[in-house]
Amino acid sequence: ECIGHRRSCKEDRNGCCKLYTCNCWYPTPDDQWCKCLL
């Protein structure tokens, strides 16, 4: 499992999530967080 700050799920394709399912939630209007799960 990998958790990281991302501006969007699409951008995270270049990060740790690229082989996993990316679930995003929005702690603030200006930020998104991705949690990558197997």
From Swiss-Prot:
Keyword Secreted attributed: yes
Positions of disulphide bridges: C2-C17, C9-C22, C16-C36, C24-C34
Tissue: Expressed by the venom gland.
Origin superkingdom: Eukaryota
A GO term from the CC aspect: extracellular region
Keywords assigned by UniProt, alphabetized: Disulfide bond, Knottin, Secreted
Keyword Disulfide bond listed: yes
Predominant location: secreted
Subcellular location: Secreted
Membrane-crossing residue ranges in chain numbering: none
Family: Belongs to the neurotoxin 02 (plectoxin) family. 09 subfamily.
This protein's domain notes: The presence of a 'disulfide through disulfide knot' structurally defines this protein as a knottin.
Protein name: U9-ctenitoxin-Pk1a
